């Protein structure tokens, strides 16, 4: 990755009722990264997001959490990108991924949204799918449960025991992306 400012976005839904749900793992990883940056989230009025400004892996980083619901998060992401003059190549979105087993972390550039409405909103608002993604596996729903219901459920007690470690590993993956770029970070992580 370049030495330009990076925009790292954790996806989730606002409000205490969503705080511990699978869909909010992006917010959880953003919290881990904010701790590493030594900062606290503050409202950025022009974008509709909460942000922390600081450094990670030797890079200037704007860490953001949209304050809108997941399916409307693109407006906040595009607003931050415009305000801080960050192009899509320097945006990393951290999000939950149904198609990966719980705790599996994968990095990718662009591609489809896989039914993820937060990614769809971001791609639409940025008018490109070519931004980096840190995908955090939450697993598939059991039986015939609707995936839309599953992502809004809390993690199981077994998963909760491992969640802090998963968030640390996802934060490590973001730092690898910032430091090494996609290919080298993928080689280390995958």
From Swiss-Prot:
GO BP terms: protein quality control for misfolded or incompletely synthesized proteins; rescue of stalled ribosome
Main location: cytoplasm
Regions that span the bilayer: none
Site feature: Stabilizes the basic form of H active site to accept a proton: 96
Name of protein: Peptidyl-tRNA hydrolase
UniProt function note: Hydrolyzes ribosome-free peptidyl-tRNAs (with 1 or more amino acids incorporated), which drop off the ribosome during protein synthesis, or as a result of ribosome stalling.
Residues with site note (Discriminates between blocked and unblocked aminoacyl-tRNA): 13
InterPro entries assigned: Pept_tRNA_hydro, Pept_tRNA_hydro_CS, Pept_tRNA_hydro_sf
CC annotations in GO: cytoplasm
Active site: 23
Family statement: Belongs to the PTH family.
Documented EC number(s): 3.1.1.29
Subunit structure: Monomer.
Binding site for tRNA: 18, 69, 71, 117
A molecular function GO annotation: peptidyl-tRNA hydrolase activity
The protein's enzyme class: hydrolase
Catalytic activity: an N-acyl-L-alpha-aminoacyl-tRNA + H2O = an N-acyl-L-amino acid + a tRNA + H(+)
Alphabetical keyword list: Cytoplasm, Hydrolase, RNA-binding, tRNA-binding
One Pfam family linked to the record: Pept_tRNA_hydro
Subcellular location: Cytoplasm
């Amino acid at each position: 990755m370049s030495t330009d400012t990076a925009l790292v976005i954790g996806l989730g839904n606002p409000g205490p009722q969503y705080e511990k749900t699978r869909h909010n793992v992006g917010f959880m990883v953003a919290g881990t990264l904010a701790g590493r940056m030594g900062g606290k989230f503050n409202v950025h009025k022009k974008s509709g997001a909460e942000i922390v400004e600081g450094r990670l892996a030797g890079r200037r980083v704007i860490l953001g959490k949209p304050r809108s619901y997941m399916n409307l998060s693109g407006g906040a992401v595009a607003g931050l990108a415009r305000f801080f003059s960050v192009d899509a190549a320097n945006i990393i979105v951290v999000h939950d991924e149904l198609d990966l087993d719980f705790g599996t972390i994968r990095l990718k550039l662009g591609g489809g949204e896989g039914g993820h409405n937060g990614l769809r909103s971001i791609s639409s608002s940025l008018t490109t799918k070519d931004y980096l993604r840190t995908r955090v596996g939450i697993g598939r729903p059991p039986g015939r449960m609707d995936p839309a219901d599953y992502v809004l459920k809390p993690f199981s007690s077994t998963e909760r025991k491992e969640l802090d470690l998963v968030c640390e590993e996802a934060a490590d993956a973001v730092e690898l992306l910032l430091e090494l770029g996609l290919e080298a970070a993928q080689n280390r992580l995958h």
